[in-house]
Amino acid sequence: MNSINVKTLRWSALVLGLGAGMYEHRSHIQCQKQKEIDENYHRQESLIESAKIAYLNTKNTPPKEDSMLPNLKKDSEDFDMDEFVKELEKNV
């Protein structure tokens, strides 16, 4: 009678251990999948933010002045009044 109780106890412990191991394995896999999803989401967020910044930088860059254009700034030493008047006439 004693041996039947010991065998039953051993088999019960084995089944409980296998069940606990399967539960732990499933929760570990689920945690890994969720972590991978979160990392992918944060990576995409950072890519979107860097793309927004790059777009704003390209949109807000001032146009480069052409060196062939006459100097139309009144404060500079190379100011050309004739070119300035011609430019005003074109705009009017």
Curated annotation (Swiss-Prot):
InterPro entries on file: ATP_synth_F0_esu_mt
Subcellular location: Mitochondrion inner membrane
UniProt GO MF annotations: proton transmembrane transporter activity; structural molecule activity
Membrane topology: Peripheral membrane protein
Biological processes per GO annotation: proton motive force-driven mitochondrial ATP synthesis
UniProtKB keywords: ATP synthesis, CF(0), Hydrogen ion transport, Ion transport, Membrane, Mitochondrion, Mitochondrion inner membrane, Transport
GO CC term, one of those recorded: proton-transporting ATP synthase complex
Domain of life: Eukaryota
Entry similarity comment: Belongs to the ATPase e subunit family.
Assembly and binders: F-type ATPases have 2 components, CF(1) - the catalytic core - and CF(0) - the membrane proton channel.
Physiological role: Mitochondrial membrane ATP synthase (F(1)F(0) ATP synthase or Complex V) produces ATP from ADP in the presence of a proton gradient across the membrane which is generated by electron transport complexes of the respiratory chain. F-type ATPases consist of two structural domains, F(1) - containing the extramembraneous catalytic core, and F(0) - containing the membrane proton channel, linked together by a central stalk and a peripheral stalk. During catalysis, ATP synthesis in the catalytic domain of F(1) is coupled via a rotary mechanism of the central stalk subunits to proton translocation.
Protein name in UniProt: ATP synthase subunit e, mitochondrial
